[in-house]
Each structure stands twice: as C-alpha cells, then as structure tokens.
C-alpha cells in the first residue's frame, strides 16, 4: 500500500456564487444532459480549463523555442490525446482546442451516449440504466454515468448480457424496435 496522496477537488466552484446568467446557463445544461448537480458541470469546465491551459502553454512554448521537433512532439501529444477521447477531429489545430465548448466533454459521457444512441428515453433514464448496471461497453459492464467514452469505443455501447433489457419481451426493447420501424 502506498501513500494515497493529497485529496483534491476535481473542480473549481464559481467565484461569484449568485450570478444570475451563469446559474441559468448551468441549470439549462444540467437539465439537457441529465446531470445530478452543478458540480458535474464545474468538473467538465475544469477538464476544458486544463486542456486550454495546455494549449496556451504550447503556443507560448512555440513562440519562445526554436526546437521544431520538441514543438511537434508536444503538439502531436496534445492533439492526439484530444482526438482519442473524441473532443477533436483528426485534422484539428491548437486553435480548435482553445475554442472547445462545455457541451463537447458532456457529449462524451456514457450517460449522454446511451441517450443519443436511443438505448434510453431520456438522459435521466440513461443515467439510471448505467448506474443499475444495464449498460456495457464491449461486453464489460460500466456503471459510471460520467465515464468518458473514447472514440474507438462509442460503437461498442450496448445492453449488458445478463440484463433483463436484452430479452425481446421486455417493454423497453419493444418500444425501441417499434420506434426503429
């Protein structure tokens, strides 16, 4: 057993807690994506903040350094990572990292993907299905709604093998099949 390290928050709360416009925007996002609370919005904002900071540091490094190989390596590392997790396309540039919106990391959540693929009627139901263990990625049960689905796994989302939702007689499956016809 090692030293567990210092516990730190994965988000930063807003500086002004009672800013009307921000509260309305966050509430709209919470409803649209079926999030549990505003903390999940702040966590997504923190993720974006880290990527933007890395892009700004890379731009500063590009203006200071003349080592083209090191610049290319750092740029390829950042853009490759964002491409693998699905936030950017394969032909993206550093400017695209700076223009990322809050919706993009929220669209990569398992809960949102389950809803968008039609496996659930609403984002809230998608969250419930994930937490109850009815959803699998490549045959492995995933019960974390905030799991960030990598680009190569987004087509592998399905119902878990032993879930009652896999039987043809289940009302939810009948509803989905009727909707697809």
Swiss-Prot record:
One cellular component term from this protein's GO annotations in UniProt: small ribosomal subunit
S4 RNA-binding domain residues: 108-177
Coiled-coil ranges (or none): none
HAMAP family, sorted: Ribosomal_uS4_A
Family, similarity comment: Belongs to the universal ribosomal protein uS4 family.
PANTHER family: 30S 40S RIBOSOMAL PROTEIN, 40S RIBOSOMAL PROTEIN S9
Name by which UniProt lists this protein: Small ribosomal subunit protein uS4
Species of the source: Methanosphaerula palustris (strain ATCC BAA-1556 / DSM 19958 / E1-9c)
């Amino acid at each position: 057993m090692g030293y567990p390290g210092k516990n730190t928050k994965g988000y930063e709360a807003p500086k002004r807690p009672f800013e009307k416009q921000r509260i309305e925007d966050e509430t709209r996002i919470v409803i649209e994506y079926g999030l549990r609370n505003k903390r999940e919005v702040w966590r997504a904002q923190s993720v974006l903040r880290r990527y933007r900071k890395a892009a700004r540091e890379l731009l500063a490094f590009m203006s200071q350094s003349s080592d083209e190989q090191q610049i290319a390596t750092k740029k390829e590392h950042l853009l490759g990572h964002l491409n693998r997790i699905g936030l950017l396309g394969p032909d993206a540039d550093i400017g695209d990292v700076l223009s990322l919106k809050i919706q993009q990391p929220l669209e990569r959540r398992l809960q949102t993907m389950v809803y968008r693929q039609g496996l659930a009627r609403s984002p809230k139901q998608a969250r419930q299905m994930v937490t109850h263990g009815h959803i699998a990625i490549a045959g492995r049960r995933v019960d974390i709604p905030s799991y960030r689905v990598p680009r190569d796994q987004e087509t592998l989302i399905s119902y878990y093998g032993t879930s009652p939702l896999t039987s043809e007689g289940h009302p939810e499956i009948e509803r989905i099949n009727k909707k697809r016809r």
